[in-house]
């Protein structure tokens, strides 16, 4: 029988432990980890994500700020705001919610964030640390998946891991983290031929493509561990993943649900990296 990887329960456990660490840091050093989230425009999905992040940060005892800007804000104004938070010693983590309006260049905004406060792990300096095997700030979704592997005792060394989707946010950093644990990694994408056959070789299958129920049982070998990063809406507005959960569960040994799988862990790792940034600030 398939085992459900309960990301929501793990996230709650980790956030409770994190709240205690935050309380100790405040009592011993007088430091409260500070996180600012900048939201540009009124994208409904982004608004939900930002509210969830704000709620989790406050529950864990963080100083939490949310800045909401009109989608007409110019790139220079946004960079100027980021620079203000770069210089603010009470803020240890800066997150600019993506996607941004078309007139704002994502890369320029990411470059503007102090790498020490880049809790999303997207700054080239942090990706460089990741590729060189010395990760500091790591993109939160792959970091959360690695925590799930650890908590559930999922062996990675020597395993065939297939990642569907090569984004800078999930696919590429996920591949590097798995390589660091001595997995054999195949990174697939929209031009990959015979995708189903490749996926069927996977001991561990991680899917992040943004296409609802794209992965059916035809893509999965019996006993595989399946990690579903997708968040999509079906015709009835119901939240679904990239994996056809019911039919894939018949073959998989372990699987993450949507919702309640990877999503809560992404927020947890955002908070954990903000806390670690605050600790590094104290030790300077």
Swiss-Prot record:
Its EC number is 1.5.1.5, 3.5.4.9. GO terms for biological process: L-histidine biosynthetic process; methionine biosynthetic process; purine nucleotide biosynthetic process; tetrahydrofolate interconversion. Pfam families: THF_DHG_CYH, THF_DHG_CYH_C. Keywords: Amino-acid biosynthesis, Histidine biosynthesis, Hydrolase, Methionine biosynthesis, Multifunctional enzyme, NADP, One-carbon metabolism, Oxidoreductase, Purine biosynthesis. It comes from the Bacteria. NADP(+) binds at residues 165-167, 190. Gene3D superfamilies: Leucine Dehydrogenase, chain A, domain 1 (3.40.50.10860), NAD(P)-binding Rossmann-like Domain (3.40.50.720). Coiled coil: none annotated. CDD domains: NAD_bind_m-THF_DH_Cyclohyd. GO terms for molecular function: methenyltetrahydrofolate cyclohydrolase activity; methylenetetrahydrofolate dehydrogenase (NADP+) activity. InterPro entries: Aminoacid_DH-like_N_sf (IPR046346), NAD(P)-bd_dom_sf (IPR036291), THF_DH/CycHdrlase (IPR000672), THF_DH/CycHdrlase_cat_dom (IPR020630), THF_DH/CycHdrlase_CS (IPR020867), THF_DH/CycHdrlase_NAD-bd_dom (IPR020631). HAMAP family: THF_DHG_CYH. Homodimer. Catalyzes the oxidation of 5,10-methylenetetrahydrofolate to 5,10-methenyltetrahydrofolate and then the hydrolysis of 5,10-methenyltetrahydrofolate to 10-formyltetrahydrofolate. This is Bifunctional protein FolD. It comes from Streptococcus equi subsp. zooepidemicus (strain MGCS10565).
